[in-house]
Amino acid sequence: MEGQAAETNHRAETVVRAELCLSAEQGPETTAYSQKRCLFLPMEVWQEAQQLLALAAPAFLSQLMIFLISIVSSIFCGHLGKVELDAVSLAITIINITGVAVGTGLAGACDTLISQTFGGSNLKLVGIILQRGILILLLFCFPCWALLINTESILLLFRQDPEVSKLTQIYVLIFLPALPAAFLYQLLAKYLQNQGIIYPQVLTGFIANIFNALFNYILLYVLGLGVMGSACANTVSQFIQMILLFLYIVWRRLYADTWGGWSQACFEEWGAFIRLAVASMLMLCIEWWAFEISMFLAGVLGMVDLAAQAIIYQVAIVVYLIPLGLCIAGSIRVGHGLGAGNTEQAKRSALVVLCMTELCALLSGILLATLKDVVAYIFTSDPNIVALVSYVLPVYSACLLFDACVAACGGILRGSGKLKVGAISHTVGYYVIGLPLGISLMFAAKLGIIGFWFGILACGIAQSIFLIIFVFKIDWKRASEEAQTRASERVEIPQKIDNKPSVYQEGCPTEQGDVDPGNVESIEFSQSSTSSEGTSPTPAGAAQHTRTLILTRGLALGCAVGTLIIGIVIRLSV
C-alpha cells in the first residue's frame, strides 16, 4: 500500500509539473484568452477540448502517414501500364482487407486495456498487456498468410482477369514477410498512443514514407522491376516503419515505467484480450469490407461508375482521418478517466468528443459539397467521371455527418470496453440495413453508385441513433468499476534505481513518472480473486497452472500453424 501511495503521489506531482510547464509556455495572453472563452464554455469543457485536440492532431497525422505508404506505391505504379496498375491496386486492397485491417483491429484491444490500466496507474501491467498482444497478433498472422497465399485462386473464382490475378499474387507473396512487421507496428503505436504519446508515430511514419518513395523510385524507375519492385518497396517500408518506432522507444526510454521484462504472465488472461480484440477487429473490418464490396459492385456497372466510386472512396478515406483522430483522442481520454475512477472526466470527455467530431464533420461536409464540381479534377479530367463524382458528393457529405458520429461513439465504446456493442451495431448497420438497401437501389432501382451511398446514409442514421442512445445510457460508475477490475492485476517489481530519467515527450513531463525501473530482477503477480485464470498460491497449484498454460498456448500455436498448412495444401492442389 505504501508503494502504491508513493507512486500515486509521484504521478500527481508529475501532472502538476506538466500543468505548470504548459501554463508557462502559454503565457499571460493565452491564459487571458482561455478565461475569455470560459465565458461561453465551462472551464472544464474548454480544458477537455484542448486536451482532446492535443491528442487528435498527432493522431490524425500518424494515421495519414500510414495511409500515404499505400497511396505513394500506387502513384509510382501509374506509369507501368493498365494491367500492372490494376494488379498493384488490387494487391494493396487485398493486403489491407485481409491482413492490415485484421492486425489493426486486433490491436484495438489495447484501446481498452492499456488506456484503462494506464489511467489506473498499474504501469507494469501495461507492459504485460503489450507482451500478450505481441504473442496473440503474431499467431493471427498464420491464418492471414493462409488466405493471402491463395489470392490468385480466389480472384479467378470471382472471374478476375488471369494476368492481373497472377501479378497480384506475385505482389502479395513478396509482401508476406512484412505482415508481422505491420502488425507489430500497429501494436507499438497503440502501446504509446494509449499512454498519450503520439508524436513518435508521426515522426517515424514520415521517415518511413520518405524511404518508401525513394525505394519505389529506385526499384521502378532505375532498376525497372515493375510490380515486384513496388512490392519490395512496400515490404521494406513496413519493416523500416516498425523498426524505427521500436528504436525510438528504446532511445527515448519510453518503455521505462511500463516494461518490467518478459514474464510468464504474458501467457495468462488471453481470453479477455482476445474477446476485446475480435470485437475491435469486427468493428473495423465490417465497415472496411463493406466499402470494398461497393468497389466490386461499381465495377459491374461500368468503368465510369468504378472510377467515380474509387475517387469518392479515396476522398472519403482522407476526410475520415479527421474524425478518426478525434475518435482516438476520445478513446484515450475516456479510458484514462475510467481507469483512474474519474467518472465525471470520462463522461465529459465523451460529450465533448461527440460535439467536436460533429462540428468537424459539418465543416468538412459543407466544404466538400461546395467543391463538388472541383474535387474530381484532382484525379481525372474525364468529363463523365467528373460529372458523376459531382452528382454523388452531396450525398456523401450527408453520410459524413452520421459516419463521424458513429466514429466518435466507437471511440467512446473502445475507451469504456463496450466493443461488443460496436461490433453488433456495425454488423446490423452495414449488412442488414446499409448494403441490402444500397445494392437494391444500385441495381433494382437503377440509381447507380449514388444508390449505394443512400444505403450507407441509412446505415449511418440508424447506427447514430442507436449508439447515441447507448452512450447516454452508459452506467459510468459501473464502467469505471469494470475498468479498475481489468487493471487489478498487481505487479510488484524489486528495482534498482540508476538515476536515468525516462523521457516521454520532449519538453514538459507527462502524466507518467520519470523514474527508471532499472534492472528488473523478478516479477510477482497476485491476481484478483475474480480472475478466471488466476494462479494458485501453492507450489503444486502453480505447477499445474504452468502445465495448463503450456498445453493451451501450445494448442493455440498448433491451430495457427495448422491453418497455414491447410492454406499451403489448397494452393498446391488447386
Curated annotation (Swiss-Prot):
Catalytic activity: thiamine(out) + H(+)(in) = thiamine(in) + H(+)(out); estrone 3-sulfate(in) + H(+)(out) = estrone 3-sulfate(out) + H(+)(in); creatinine(in) + H(+)(out) = creatinine(out) + H(+)(in); agmatine(in) + H(+)(out) = agmatine(out) + H(+)(in)
Name of one Pfam family that matches: MatE
Subcellular location: Cell membrane; Apical cell membrane
Family note: Belongs to the multi antimicrobial extrusion (MATE) (TC 2.A.66.1) family.
Bias (Low complexity) ranges: 521-538
Record topology, Cytoplasmic segments: 1-51, 108-133, 190-204, 252-271, 331-350, 406-430, 473-549
Membrane topology, record value: Multi-pass membrane protein
Domain of life of the native organism: Eukaryota
Organism: Xenopus tropicalis (Western clawed frog)
Residue segments, region Disordered: 500-541
GO biological process: one example: xenobiotic detoxification by transmembrane export across the plasma membrane
Extracellular side: 73-86, 155-168, 226-230, 292-309, 372-384, 452-453, 571-574
Name this protein carries in UniProt: Multidrug and toxin extrusion protein 1
GO molecular function: antiporter activity; organic cation transmembrane transporter activity; xenobiotic transmembrane transporter activity
Keywords assigned: Cell membrane, Membrane, Transmembrane, Transmembrane helix, Transport
